[in-house]
Amino acid sequence: MSTSQTDNVKASTHATEYDSVTNNIVVAALYKFTRFADFEKYRDPILNTMLDNDVKGTLLIASEGINGTISGTRQGIDNVLDYLRSIEEIGSFTFKESYTDAQPFYRTKVKLKKEIVTMGVENIDPLQSVGRYVKPSDWNALISDPDVILIDTRNDYEVKIGTFQNAVNPNTETFREFPEYVAKELDPSKHKKVAMFCTGGIRCEKSTAFMREQGFEEVYHLEGGILKYLEEVPASDSMWEGDCFVFDNRVSVNHNLEKGSYEQCFACRMPITQAEMQSPAYIKGESCPHCIDKATDEQKARFREREHQMQLAQKRGEAHIGSDVIDVIEKRKAAKIEARRQADAANKTKAG
């Protein structure tokens, strides 16, 4: 198995360095495929460790492993990562870091799932078969080979704001559509060398394993994903074009792993440019040029009311700069969880 599955890998240098004053929020993206049969019992301990350290974000756990992105202070992130490593079934794992000056998540969640990344195909096991890992330093040479077909495994809206030169866009709306794309567009007898990439590497673990099962023998994928490539390859040598979409409030990051030039429509969640925000179709919290003709009147009314309630909450002082009503709600939930945990502990003490 590659070091991407077995070692705690974190580069010593980053495009944007940690700064205790400005870039003081650490964003850690992690995953590991592993045999995790009793994963359900770890949901609450993991969640409580995140809450105790004021770490936000979402972690998915399933019988096939763990996946997610979390953010917090340097000490908070280190404490959570140390706890995850202490779980025997998880142990060491790869994670990628970037830094920002504002909390990119509002919520703290640990979800129980059937899969840590959903492809919708049964019995795809990256622990048994997977593509060949290619380090960021070797990626340019591989994708410059005219015999290699380069495929972006991400969703269409991600591809549109940035991708590698000459990459093929499968035009999928979700990762579940990828197997259908392969069946229709790719042929092991014609496409002898296939290179694939995604944001952090996890989708390629599944997609390359699937490709191997379909008879594609020479399948490669970018180790650590786009984020690791942007971290390690200088912009002057880069074959990446545009921003990289990320699943948090930063929306996208540029080549320096700093917040990119995109915002997000809170109605449809699509990345939008500053120019699109000047469009008559853009109404904050309600619509944008991507969804103005897709949302029903009922949906628009619901979006409008949500935006209204958020503004009212801010006026009441329930939210403050750098936060919003969702953050307040999540803090209340966290307090309830803590109260329930203490009550359970007290009941167990009495019973004993």
UniProtKB/Swiss-Prot annotation:
GO biological process: tRNA modification
Residue span(s) of domain Rhodanese: 144-238
Top-level taxonomic group: Bacteria
InterPro entries: Rhodanese-like_dom, Rhodanese-like_dom_sf, TrhO, TRHO_N
Keywords assigned: Oxidoreductase, tRNA processing
GO terms assigned for molecular function: oxidoreductase activity, acting on paired donors, with incorporation or reduction of molecular oxygen
Recorded family membership: Belongs to the TrhO family.
Protein name per Swiss-Prot or TrEMBL: tRNA uridine(34) hydroxylase
